[in-house]
């Protein structure tokens, strides 16, 4: 995926709902695309970078050679990567405020309790990052769910509008995001990254599903 030139892969991709992504070269809110661990999220990021001004968070890998390889692969279609830090969040906020696009993994376990809320995911309460809600609240950017499902001939990219969900309070908004992810998984269960310990951070006293 990261070794092949992006133009040589473009014919493998079909897109549904591209019209939902709104950007503005003249300023004004852009778009926040939420990409869960379903299908091939790296393909989704490459597509967004090739079509729009994409700015995304990136956490460096300890081993420099591997870090160079991953970073080069993720940037090859034009993405600008910023650090997972307060400065990085400021950068993506600035990008979407000025008409750009950012991509976020909404089902990634938050770094600490203050950056997440416990809301249901398939009926089990678990920590869910508040970053998408906070970015939307501070930028008025449109929020879209994007998945890149594997097919026999390549990838089917599907976009879904979540703006109505995001207009609610944080708990309702995050619950709505999780429901949208659940609905995307149903029927595509084999393509979700169940190995990722999504439920490892739960309310005190609740069952440890990985214990």
Spans of features found by a protein language model:
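Membrane-anchoring hydrophobic helices of lipid-metabolizing enzymes
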Residues: 1-32, 67-71, 76-79
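A conditional alpha-helix N-cap/helix-loop micro-motif detector
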Residues: 11-15, 38, 63, 82-86, ...
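Non-catalytic C-terminal accessory region of glycerolipid acyltransferases
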Residues: 22-27, 50-51, 87-211
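Short beta-strand->loop
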Residues: 32-36, 55-61, 129, 146
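Solvent-exposed coil/turn segments that connect beta secondary-structure elements
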Residues: 38, 61, 107-109
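Membrane-embedded segments
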Residues: 40-43, 47-50, 54-59, 64
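Short, conserved active-site entrance elements at the starts or edges of catalytic domains
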Residues: 55-91, 95, 113-116
